[in-house]
Amino acid sequence: GDGSFGLNAMEIDTAVRHKIAVLVVISLNGGWTADPDKNKPGRELGYTRYDKMAEALGAYGAYVDKPEDIRPALEKAQKEVDKGRVAVVNVRTDYRARAGTLAFASYST
């Protein structure tokens, strides 16, 4: 998600400089989901435009805020990766959404 990406975001610079073609998809849910009730200090992260940061570093960046735009954004990003570029797709998601299909879906840190 966006919290984890924020801790390592400058690795996009490393990938661009070393021409490591990679596609990064970020779940931009605006905070740490370990606190879905938003009670803990520091939970809120805002909705950082990491796609713009990626562009500033020389990567391809896309921002998605509607479900119907996810597939086209991923397809365009993959074309950029196929050309040897780094691509970041920043997908705004609902912080309350949790994957219920995984055995550890209820796990929170």
What are the language-model segments listed below?
Residues 1-109:
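Thiamine diphosphate
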